């Protein structure tokens, strides 16, 4: 099984995909493949960020109970 890439590696790969597509000098078939790859990477990155946000919004109280911390999100989540 392949080793899972880090968030930073996926982000760098997505940036490269976007750069390739912006240049516009690649064949249509490759552009479609790159676009699909970019969508998949974007989805993976969003999931990683969502999980990180869930982790960061939990605060341990003195008695050891977890409570959610309201960071004033803009309502785009769930």
From Swiss-Prot:
Origin superkingdom: Bacteria
GO biological-process terms attached to the record: DNA catabolic process
InterPro entries according to UniProt: Exonuc_VII_S, Exonuc_VII_ssu_sf
Reactions catalysed according to its record: Exonucleolytic cleavage in either 5'- to 3'- or 3'- to 5'-direction to yield nucleoside 5'-phosphates
Entry's EC annotation: 3.1.11.6
Cysteines engaged in disulfide bonds, as pairs: none
UniProt entry keywords in alphabetical sequence: Cytoplasm, Exonuclease, Hydrolase, Nuclease
Record keyword DNA repair present: no
Cellular localisation: Cytoplasm
A Pfam family recorded for this sequence: Exonuc_VII_S
Family: Belongs to the XseB family.
PANTHER family to which the protein is assigned, alphabetical: EXODEOXYRIBONUCLEASE 7 SMALL SUBUNIT
Function recorded in the entry: Bidirectionally degrades single-stranded DNA into large acid-insoluble oligonucleotides, which are then degraded further into small acid-soluble oligonucleotides.
Complex and partners: Heterooligomer composed of large and small subunits.
Protein name: Exodeoxyribonuclease 7 small subunit
Species this protein is from: Pediococcus pentosaceus (strain ATCC 25745 / CCUG 21536 / LMG 10740 / 183-1w)
